[in-house]
Amino acid sequence: MKSFYGILCVAVLMMFHLEMSESRSNFQMLLEDPDYLSLEKRCLNVGQKCTPGNNKCCHTYICSSLDSKCFYR
C-alpha cells in the first residue's frame, strides 16, 4: 500500500512540474512578443480615451460616444 502512495505522489509531483514548466514557457513567450505591451493589444481602463464602435475597454467597461472614454456600464 505504501508503494501505491509513493507512485501516486511521484505522479502528482511530475504533473505539477510539467504544468509549471508549461506556464513558464507561455509567460516567456508573452515577454518576447513585441506587441504584448503595445497600446493596440492592451485593454483600456475607466477614463482612458477610446474610439466608439471599436471597444477595447477592459472587462465590462464600454466606450462612451459622448466623450470617447471608457466607463463602467
UniProtKB/Swiss-Prot annotation:
UniProt function note: Putative neurotoxin.
Disulfide bonds listed in the record: 43-58, 50-63, 57-70
The protein's name in its UniProt record: Putative neurotoxin NaH-Cpp1a
The keyword Disulfide bond is assigned to this record: yes
UniProt comment concerning the protein's domains: The presence of a 'disulfide through disulfide knot' structurally defines this protein as a knottin.
Leader sequence residues: 1-23
Localization per Swiss-Prot or TrEMBL: Secreted; Nematocyst
UniProtKB keywords: Disulfide bond, Knottin, Nematocyst, Neurotoxin, Secreted, Signal, Toxin
Organism: Calliactis polypus
Tissues where the protein occurs: Expressed outside of acontia.
Protein origin, superkingdom: Eukaryota
Coiled-coil intervals, chain numbering: none
